[in-house]
Amino acid sequence: MGLYDDVAAYVPFNEQERADKRVMLAALRDDPDCFDRCAQAHVTCSIWVVDESKQHTLMVYHKIYDSWSWIGGHADGNRDVASVALRELEEETGVRHARIVPCGPGSLFSLEVLTVDGHEKHGAYVSSHLHLNVTYLAVADPCEETRIKPDENSGVRWVKLEEALSCSSEPWIRDRIYRKLIEKLAHIDIGREV
C-alpha cells in the first residue's frame, strides 16, 4: 500500500483530522509532485517519540520556528515516508534505535495539514506553503545518546508530556497537535520490545 491508501484507510480522530484527510487525499490523488518540496502543498512527516512509560517525549529546539518541537522533515521524493521519519529522527537527534508503533494503516498515528509561513533557509527565501504531514509514533530509550543538528536545531531533550505543551511557543501546534497526540497516546498500547 502507498501513502494514498494509508491515508484513505486512516480513521480520523477528530474534526481537524477529518478535514485535513480530505485535503491530503486530493493532493495525493491530483498532484504527482506532492512528494517533492517544489509543490506548494507537499508531503512531510513527523515522529512523536516517547519512552516505554509513555511519560516523556523527545523534542528539538527548532531554529526556523524558534520553539521546542517534534521531529520531522520533507519526503523529498521518497514515498516510504515512515523511513523518512526514522531518518529525520537520526539526523536531528542522533537516536538510531527507535521503533515505530504500528497504530494505524501504514503505522500512521496522526495526520495534519500544517501552514508554513515564508522564511529564510540557508540564505534563500522560502515562500509560504502547506505541509501535508503524517505523524508516526515511535518508542526510544531516553538513555540513548543524543546530539543536535546545528543547521536545524540548537537543542535536543526529553521532556514530560505535559511539558511539551508548556515549552512550545507555537500556539496552534501546541493546542491542536501536541494536545491531540498526548490524548491519542493514552489510548495506544505501545507494546514492549521482545
PLM regions and their residue ranges:
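Unchanged
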Residues: A75-W172
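Acidic, metal-coordinating catalytic segment for phosphate/diphosphate chemistry
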Residues: A9-S46
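Charged phosphate-binding loop/patch that engages nucleotide di/tri-phosphates or the phosphate backbone
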Residues: S169-V194
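N-terminal strand-loop-strand
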Residues: F35-W70
